[in-house]
């Protein structure tokens, strides 16, 4: 259910955009993200920092989009969020406190150098997606950008996740059997 909840604002944004326009879709995105945060809080009793950052960015850039009736703000939101994620990953790695290791290290045992590579890989991935978003958002029609945001970036993120998981599993430390002798 939590994974479906992560996609709820995106699905609502896309649907409302197709039915109405970018400005109504932006308002719907703000509302859907607020509902997402409320559900996460009441059902799981916890809201992750990533969700809070996303909510803040959606609210700020969505409000600017609506106030100035300029879709450039909502387009920039994607790149700014990805940039913030890349910076957070880079800083966490520089401080030897990998965010990715903190998230997955209990389930997957791997050497610190593997976690460092995966962390840097994700930071570069987010930078690449941010740059790609700027290109698509400001060089191609709005319809193309919306499709790219919803389907392209989602597919790229899923592919990156699969690649990362395979890489970690390939280099994971074997489970130690405490029952042997």
Swiss-Prot record:
Main subcellular location: membrane
Topological type in the membrane: Multi-pass membrane protein
Presence of keyword Protein biosynthesis: no
Keywords, in A-Z order: Cell inner membrane, Cell membrane, Membrane, Transmembrane, Transmembrane helix
InterPro entries hit by this protein: YciB
Highest taxon in the source lineage: Bacteria
Subcellular compartments: Cell inner membrane
Family: Belongs to the YciB family.
Described purpose of this protein according to its UniProt entry: Plays a role in cell envelope biogenesis, maintenance of cell envelope integrity and membrane homeostasis.
Source organism per UniProt: Shewanella denitrificans (strain OS217 / ATCC BAA-1090 / DSM 15013)
Listed name of the protein: Inner membrane-spanning protein YciB
GO cellular component, one term: plasma membrane
Transmembrane segments: 22-42, 50-70, 72-92, 118-138, 148-168
